[in-house]
A protein has these predicted regions:
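Conserved non-catalytic scaffold segment of RNase H-like nuclease domains
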Residues: 1-79, 124
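Substrate-recognition/cap helix-loop segment adjacent to the acidic, metal-dependent catalytic center
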Residues: 79-100
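Active-site-proximal helix-loop-helix substrate-binding element of RNase H-like nuclease domains
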Residues: 24-26, 30-32, 36-39, 43-46, ...
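Acidic, Mg2+-coordinating catalytic module of metal-dependent nucleases/exonucleases
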Residues: 72-78, 83-84, 119-157
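Active-site catalytic microenvironments for nucleophilic, acid-base chemistry
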Residues: 88-92, 111, 147-151
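Non-catalytic, surface-exposed connector residues within folded enzymatic/regulatory domains
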Residues: 49, 99-102
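Substrate-binding/catalytic groove segments of enzymes
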Residues: 92-96, 114-121, 152
Length: 157
């Protein structure tokens, strides 16, 4: 099993200048070479990443410094991304600053369009390429969210 080695976050606001990049070292000796290859890192590089507790503490602190109120976890693939962020926060920190809920971008866009099948059409609003670099991917998602907001969906930011 491969737990995600890297993750990125961005505060959704017009400048998109507040970003976070976390790289966690493995927590298991088991790993999948094909899955790790997507990250662009070798197993040897992955072993040099920071301890998960340190990364998650830094991420929590970054959220506290950059987000007003409780942060909202919004993702392209919420079911995948949420499970491990939630686990890491609870296991290493004892709580998750996002609480117990999140939003999937495709569902937000489907609601705006009133079309269940519009769930992947929002991706056309990304300006930053979806490269699987976590910060690039988060920036592209945030760009799309800003456009979706311009199209009329109300957001708390």
């Amino acid at each position: 099993m491969l737990f995600r080695s890297c993750f990125g976050a961005v505060v959704v606001e017009p400048s998109l200048s507040k970003t976070f990049y976390g790289k966690t070292r493995p927590i298991s000796d088991e790993w999948n070479p094909e899955a790790l290859a997507i990250s662009g890192f070798s197993r040897e590089e992955h072993l040099t990443f920071d301890e998960p507790h340190e990364v998650m503490s830094n991420f929590r602190d970054w959220l506290n410094q950059n987000v007003n109120g409780r942060p909202i976890f919004i993702s392209d693939n919420l079911a995948f991304d949420w499970q491990w962020i939630n686990y890491y926060f609870h296991y290493y920190i004892g709580s998750n600053p996002f609480g117990f809920s999140g939003r999937r971008i495709g569902d937000l866009y489907s609601g705006l369009e009133k079309d269940f099948f519009a769930g992947s059409k929002w991706k056309k609003f990304r300006k930053t390429s979806h490269t699987h670099n976590p910060v690039d991917d988060a920036l592209g998602n945030a760009e799309a969210l800003l456009t979706i907001r311009e199209l009329g969906l109300k957001f708390p930011f």
